[in-house]
Amino acid sequence: MDEKRPPRPPMQKGITCTDLGNGIYNFATPPVGFQQYLILGQEKALLIDSGMGIGSLRREIEKVTNLPIVLINTHGHPDHCGGNAEFAPALMCPAEFDVYEKMATLEYRQKDSGPKPGGPGGPGGHPGEGPKGGHPMEDHGKRPELQPTGPAPVPVEDGAQIDLGGRVVEVLYTPGHTHGSICIFDKLTGSLFVGDNVMGERVSVYEWNSGTIEDLHRSLLRMKALEPSKLYSGHRPNVLEPEILEREIRCADQLLNGAVGVPQKVRGGAMALAYEAEGVCICYDENKIR
């Protein structure tokens, strides 16, 4: 692990850092507390996602560690890789490259970072993120500056082992929320970083870049087989108990066996179907079952 450091100076407005223990840190970033994670090894630090790119995440990370930073993106949505420009090219599943190229640009983030009329919104269309009306990035009438468009990502393959020095993490291909979503498994602690495939409020499988319910079901079974000790999601509530996997698996299984959700307005006022069971909700496109 990294050596003991003096107390950290104050954080930038809107960015918080939480020490989760065992060399794992959580950074919540604007506009609505997107979740990034830092895993410290003896030689390197792995940063999982970079947020929307508001403010300088790197500046805050450097208050925690001076280790070289390796960045990996769980998927290509702008709220997960908008801050990539501050780091060396990120590792990413090749199936996400087209998503990243279209959605993580500065221009896209400037247009897309607020709630959309007619449905829950905020970047990525996640529920409960962004106030009703207005723009979650506005600060007294001014929008904060965003990081520029990041460099092209570097491919990472399913099963890749990333050695941080005395600590190895594994990359798992887990399509569902998007075609190329990945999870990161910390073998030292059993922690599983799940991106947006597992969420406390709602999992979305309705966008043009989403996989299918069948993809998600298969990925959830793979996650469960790891017997993780804790799950860390890309959105609040960000720390989840592994038992939520069982409930989400059953929810997806019911959809695969004919259950139908209720119509719901989503991103941009579009319509999707929302199916809830055992406190888990999957919001999906009827054409994305299999």
Predicted regions and their residues:
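Metallo-beta-lactamase
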Residues: 45, 52-53, 145-147, 154, ...
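Short, basic/glycine-rich phosphate-binding loops at helix/coil junctions
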Residues: 37-41, 133-139, 196-199
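Short glycine/proline-enriched coil/turn segments at helix->beta-strand junctions
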Residues: 42, 65-68, 84-90, 187-189, ...
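Short, basic/low-complexity N-terminal boundary segments at the transition from targeting/disordered tails
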Residues: 1-18, 138-142
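Conserved beta-strand hairpin/beta-sheet module of binuclear metal-dependent hydrolase folds
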Residues: 13-63, 184-195
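Accessory terminal helices/loops
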Residues: 1-9, 123-127, 135, 221-230, ...
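Short, hydrophobic/aromatic-rich segments at coil-to-beta transitions
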Residues: 20-26, 159, 168-170
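Active-site HxH/HxHxD metal-binding segment of metal-dependent hydrolases
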Residues: 54-163, 251-261
